[in-house]
Amino acid sequence: MTAKDIFFDTDARAKLKVGVDKLANAVKVTLGPAGRNVLIDKKFGAPTSTKDGVTVAKEIELADAVENMGAQMVREVASKTSDVAGDGTTTATVLAQAIYREGLKNVTAGARPIDLKRGIDRAVKEVVAELKAISRSISSKKEIAQVGTISANNDPEIGELIAEAMEKVGKDGVITVEEAKGMETELKVVEGMQFDRGYLSPYFVTNSDTMEAELDNPLILIYDKKISNMKELLPILEKSAQSGRPLLIIAEDIEGEALATLVVNKLRGTLKVCAVKAPGFGDRRKAMLEDIAILTGGTVISEEKGYKLENATLSYLGQAGSVSLDKDNTTLVEGKGASDAIKARINEIKGQIEKSTSDYDTEKLQERLAKLSGGVAVINIGASTEVEMKEKKARVEDALHATRAAVQEGIVVGGGVALIRAIKGLNNAQADNEDQKIGIEIVRRALEEPLRQIVANTGTQDGAVVLEKVKEGEGDFGFNARTETYENLVEAGVVDPTKVTRSALENAASVAGILLTTEAAITDIKDDKMDMPAMPPGGMGGMGGMY
């Protein structure tokens, strides 16, 4: 077992504080509209320029092991806030640094860390309640655009794009961010349900200009196994041909004789037909086939349910207004499924999302939800250089997360003012002893820090003066760091999602509390000999040690 170094008491806390400060100081320069960029060196390719707090935090690794532990604890604040709310990572880092700094002074002066932590936790609970009380819900396109603009570092183009995307696909719709081929940033909306499988043979194409297969008012056969034998497919083909409507076949695979027969009949004009592989794999494929069946009002023909392909009737087939397929994607528009069944399926998927513990599963469930509830919007990011493209893409993703958070829990006044207004909630915080009172006061002081930092980043204003003026005002009155004026911030479009502000405070207090109650830090002893590269062997094999 490797030998360990142990640091106790003030030694441990002092080193942890150095790590906390190094990371927080690098992150907090990005806060607010006047925040600066941070350049991050990459081993390969050009350096990355970012104004995103969590991106900066994730890149920081310190040489001293105890300092690094402090830095990593604060990095956790940024990461957790990003995961939960998608934005507010810099605010969370600033709050964590402030709570730890103020708390450490009191621990060094003899306060009991555990009581400080209890006081901090009680204070945070009251502040969160106050934030919820002053929160207001949003619904209009203009309000959504304001949130997106602020989170994208005051880029109104991005705010407008996100608002337009949400308007078109709904708040449950999937909005994805991709890199464009050109310099223009644009929004593309795919109506209906789209999945990433294209036609099985180019001979199914009906429009040779666009190389797409287009089926109007088709019947849709959904089968969960491979089809290789024409005999089992023939009865349902004959029935659909008699109906005079095109047929789309979705199956695990269609091969051999079955595929060849379909192609020949399509080319002769005997059948209007197209075949496509089912999307997904394993259990996810079964779920997606069921989604398609519910959306189109059909039935998944599955032997597990007791259905056989050769016995299928027209009542088993789904229907849609139109279907278009290219070599990569299939899009179903105007599925004819019962709206009650679709709503029930949507609610079932929402329930699965709430219970899901895996980020990957949650993402896939949200994609399925969006496909059922109205479509997919794609924001294609254009830029002159790759560095600019990556930076802009990160900002759009941040803005998208923040906008979703705003739709969920509403908005509060931005610019650090909501935390100042929420200070009055501390009047309700109960303390059992003097140290808990100090914990409450620590939070009172820390809540001022984001506003101080936003002002400091302007480089032209005094944080203490601005803070006092904001405290004298009421409601939405605050300091707009972009225009360096005092005004009604909500009317000026300076707003933050309540979820972002709440998550930032809760996560900051949680990690700062753990750091304050830390009494020892244990690290591996660094052995310089272990770090040296191995000596190259002397000479070559069979050369008698010659060089």
Swiss-Prot record:
It is an enzyme of class 5 (isomerase). It comes from the Bacteria. The keyword Cytoplasm applies. One of its GO terms (cellular component) is cytoplasm. This is Chaperonin GroEL. Forms a cylinder of 14 subunits composed of two heptameric rings stacked back-to-back. Interacts with the co-chaperonin GroES. Keywords: ATP-binding, Chaperone, Cytoplasm, Isomerase, Nucleotide-binding. PROSITE patterns: CHAPERONINS_CPN60. One of its GO terms (molecular function) is unfolded protein binding. ATP binds at T30, L31, G32, P33, K51, D87, G88, T89, T90, T91, G415, D496. Gene3D superfamilies: GroEL, GroEL-like equatorial domain, TCP-1-like chaperonin intermediate domain. Belongs to the chaperonin (HSP60) family. The gene is groEL. Residues 538-547 have a biased composition (Gly residues). Its EC number is 5.6.1.7. One of its GO terms (biological process) is protein refolding. Residues 528-547 are annotated as: Disordered. It comes from Chlorobium chlorochromatii (strain CaD3). InterPro entries: Chaperonin_Cpn60_CS (IPR018370), Cpn60/GroEL (IPR001844), Cpn60/GroEL/TCP-1 (IPR002423), GroEL-like_apical_dom_sf (IPR027409), GROEL-like_equatorial_sf (IPR027413), TCP-1-like_intermed_sf (IPR027410).
